[in-house]
Amino acid sequence: MLYLASRSPRRHELLQRLDVPFQTLELDVPEVRAPGESPEHYVHRVALDKARAGLALVQADDAQAIVLGSDTEVVLGERVFGKPVDVDDAIAMLTVLAGRTHQVLTAVVLVGAQRPPLQALVVSEVTFDALDATRIAAYAASGEPMGKAGAYAIQGRAERFITHLSGSYSGVMGLPLFQTSQLLTAFGAH
């Protein structure tokens, strides 16, 4: 059985598009970047931590379990923009991202008992229009930025702020479908 180690409704929705049966695991895995840790290493580590935590939860009952972990972070330079803690934090993030091109890093990891993990890192570039304080405040007040890396949802109202996307749309949403499908096939789960 395939398990998705994620609370994200977007990842659940995206994984359904691959027509693979799976169950979702509700896990609480710390997402804290270590001092000096590169954004790439951080996103890989968190995805692996989620997958391993999920495997530890189910492998006693399912020896054939395959667990998918994923993490998405918005990055500008070496700064990682996680999920905003409140509306003011969302406004601060969006103010920095406005009028600039940033990267969205999404790592996908598959783990199974007695198998080495398989992983992929997808890097997309997203350019935001120049946004004034009024537009940023209105978007932040909508509540949509909460729970989203970088304080925006590409599939929601923030889509109108994006002038250019290079990379994976589904990766920016939280699960790059092409790469995930390849990993599942390589792992024998698709």
Swiss-Prot record:
Cofactor section: a divalent metal cation
Official protein name in the record: dTTP/UTP pyrophosphatase
Keywords from the UniProt entry: Cytoplasm, Hydrolase, Nucleotide metabolism
The protein's enzyme class: hydrolase
Family that this chain belongs to: Belongs to the Maf family. YhdE subfamily.
Taxonomic source organism: Xanthomonas campestris pv. campestris (strain ATCC 33913 / DSM 3586 / NCPPB 528 / LMG 568 / P 25)
Catalysis: reaction(s): dTTP + H2O = dTMP + diphosphate + H(+); UTP + H2O = UMP + diphosphate + H(+)
GO CC, any one term: cytoplasm
Pfam family membership, one: Maf
Active-site residue list: 71
Subcellular location: Cytoplasm
GO molecular function, one term: dTTP diphosphatase activity
Marked site: Important for substrate specificity: 10, 72, 155
Any one Gene Ontology BP term: nucleotide metabolic process
Entry EC number(s): 3.6.1.9
Function: Nucleoside triphosphate pyrophosphatase that hydrolyzes dTTP and UTP. May have a dual role in cell division arrest and in preventing the incorporation of modified nucleotides into cellular nucleic acids.
